[in-house]
Amino acid sequence: MAPPSVFSEVPQAQPVLVFKLTADFREDPDPRKVNLGVGAYRTDDCHPWVLPVVKKVEQKIANDNSLNHEYLPILGLAEFRSCASRLALGDDSPALKEKRVGGVQSLGGTGALRIGADFLARWYNGTNNKNTPVYVSSPTWENHNAVFSAAGFKDIRSYRYWDAEKRGLDLQGFLNDLENAPEFSIIVLHACAHNPTGTDPTPEQWKQIASVMKHRFLFPFFDSAYQGFASGNLERDAWAIRYFVSEGFEFFCAQSFSKNFGLYNERVGNLTVVGKEPESILRVLSQMEKIVRITWSNPPAQGARIVADTLSNPELFEEWKGNVKTMADRILTMRSELRARLEALKTPGTWNHITDQIGMFSYTGLNPKQVEYLINEKHIYLLPSGRINVSGLTTKNLDYVATSIHEAITKIQ
């Protein structure tokens, strides 16, 4: 008699919610269906958009006979790493001028977070510091908790961020939680376009956050997934990161080029490391090289080449900025239009938070029962938290979505 499968005791894992939502949407035959759950940009025709500048650079790469498919270095394409870090920190960054910046090409923003988390678990402020508290915002992107847990961190906590009652930032709660955090705790910060709330601190509020973090010796780990995509302005979206440099912080910054280049399936990311002196950066990168070697060994080239070629060419860079602004402007327009329709319908509650928020996502304030109603009765797909992808709205479905939200709120408490 053959023994049972060695996999017979493996439990079925829960599906990843946002991808399950998209699968359900695809299978729904209803012609009215709207997908507000997907974490990717859509045009006004509800299609993915390949940026014109990306098409141009892809053609240029395809025609370059000097290129081949040899392995990239373990830390990635050098031109990409330097261009990516420069984009985050700015051309005039004192950290760049003083050569105390390093970069690691990664598999998207998630890969950058994981390499950073693995390094911190091994080497942060000593060795083997898996008991160091890691703070993430409440709420945050669900992968933040999972990545730091998988890296071995045992004490993951949340800091207050979203005030559900006023539908905005709970600054005082945020600052109080930072004040009470043990010294040298790791704080995960959203650089701009906070996911899922779309609510960002103002520059003045960032200054207060930095002040508390400085005197409590807290370590910032920025997640920058939307630079340029949030406001349409690269500098504005990197303001917090650059301010922390000016205040003398050492920090990590996980960068993603999925959204602002539309390179979702190329997995293009970078981990920017800012230290106090060049020597420590070299040592940090030497250890990160060891971590990358046992994780993916060498990163893929295509997406990194597209980004590096674009950022290093003044003409292509300007064209890319225009493409990014096109996406950001469409999202801003959809925010205004949705708010105007809800207010015209006299939908209960206030709706200014929709236009106060920024970036791809909006935290609507809808509760799980109202979300369930929208999915089951109206075929409008969104997360149970009430988060919507604003770029899923179009001139063709806005009226339907607004009246459906109005109906959900007036019918379901």
Swiss-Prot record:
Q: What is its EC number?
A: 2.6.1.1, 2.6.1.3
Q: Which GO terms describe its molecular function?
A: L-aspartate:2-oxoglutarate aminotransferase activity; L-cysteine transaminase activity; pyridoxal phosphate binding
Swiss-Prot/TrEMBL keywords: Amino-acid biosynthesis, Aminotransferase, Cytoplasm, Phosphoprotein, Pyridoxal phosphate, Transferase
What domain of life is recorded for the organism? Eukaryota
Record InterPro entries: Aminotransferase_I/II_large, Asp_trans, NHTrfase_class1_PyrdxlP-BS, PyrdxlP-dep_Trfase, PyrdxlP-dep_Trfase_major, PyrdxlP-dep_Trfase_small
Q: Which PANTHER family match?
A: ASPARTATE AMINOTRANSFERASE, ASPARTATE AMINOTRANSFERASE, CYTOPLASMIC
Which protein, by its recorded name, is this?
Aspartate aminotransferase, cytoplasmic
- UniProt source species: Macaca fascicularis
